[in-house]
A protein has these predicted regions:
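Alpha-helical transmembrane segments of multi-pass small-molecule/ion transporters
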Residues: 1-304
Length: 304
């Protein structure tokens, strides 16, 4: 019953999103507005509160150090494969980052609580060191005329990144403790906590609304998704093996690493397409891997 209490609300939210699209209760523009509200105004406070209490120990540093070469190798392989086998301009973006924002953080909050979201936030910031350069390279030749400087600036000024760094700074410096002493800290926590409430339901609704698996290029979609899954599985085994060597590793760190490795490719990938074929293909890959994520989530919820 405990598992059902976790899983059923998720399936209901996703199902409502799918129903809303099928019955045309909302337009894509309206759903996009919901996503932008959550990404810009709700998830940043979650990360802020979580990072305030974050403890950056050996295990956190270990996951950061491990993740960088893993994503670097997969990205380099993707660029090479793009030349020889998969001639899709945005192909490398499918291997440069996982979707921590729209799905990783909400699922992490549901499983482990908002106070542990910083663990996923650390992985999100770490993957940015690889995904941002890959995004710049891919976006520089989309044919849409988006300047590289503009793209980099947009990523670096992301509310999620800014609020995460602010939370770390206030927490680790001890400044938040001083604000707590004069009563200001409590007001900040209550305000940010209130803003964070819609995150899980809104984002899961959006996932259901945007789910798409076109019959066009279905074999190619399954093949690329399978490759992505194998890369993620190998990365998970390596990272879990290294964490095994680190003394006194918190079990939550292992679970969050496992959850991260099951996440789909970044939902930014379709937006970097040069044509409809690339958009359909990458959207299909992301949607298929999202199904894998939700199945994995149920397994993690049952055993964590």
């Amino acid at each position: 019953m405990a598992l059902l209490q976790t899983v059923v609300p998720i399936l209901v939210c996703i199902g409502l999103g799918f129903l809303a699209r099928k019955k045309e209760l909302l337009t894509p523009e309206q759903t996009g507005g919901i996503q932008q509200f959550v990404l810009k105004f709700c998830i940043p406070p979650v990360l802020f509160n979580s990072c305030l209490e974050a403890k950056i120990g050996a295990e956190s540093l270990t996951t950061m150090v491990m993740l960088l070469p893993v994503l670097l190798l997969s990205s380099l392989w993707a660029f090479r494969a793009r030349k020889k086998r998969y001639p899709y301009h945005n192909f490398p973006m499918l291997f440069a980052a996982h979707e921590t924002g729209m799905i990783g953080l909400p699922l992490c909050i549901i499983l482990f609580g908002a106070s542990e979201a910083y663990r996923m936030g650390i992985l999100d910031m770490t993957q940015g060191l690889i995904s941002i350069p890959v995004m710049v390279i891919v976006a520089s030749d989309t044919g849409k005329g988006a300047p590289i400087k503009t793209i980099v600036k947009k990523v670096l000024l992301s509310p999620m990144l800014i609020m995460s760094l602010l939370g770390f700074a206030l927490g680790l410096s001890g400044l938040m403790a001083r604000l707590d002493a004069v009563g200001v800290g409590g007001i900040i926590r209550q305000t940010t906590g209130f803003l964070a409430q819609p995150v899980s339901a809104a984002m899961l609704f959006s996932i259901g609304f945007n789910f798409s698996l076109s019959s066009e290029n279905r074999n190619e979609i399954f093949k690329i998704a399978g490759i992505g899954f194998l890369f993620s599985a190998a990365a998970c085994l390596v990272m879990q093996g290294v964490l095994f060597l680190v003394p006194n590793v918190d079990a939550l760190t292992r679970w969050v690493v496992l959850l991260y490795c099951t996440l789909p490719a970044s939902y930014l990938a379709p937006s970097l397409s040069r044509n409809n074929k690339e958009s359909v293909l990458t959207s299909g890959v992301c949607s298929l891997l999202t199904v894998v994520t939700l199945i994995s989530f149920c397994v993690i919820a049952a055993f964590s």
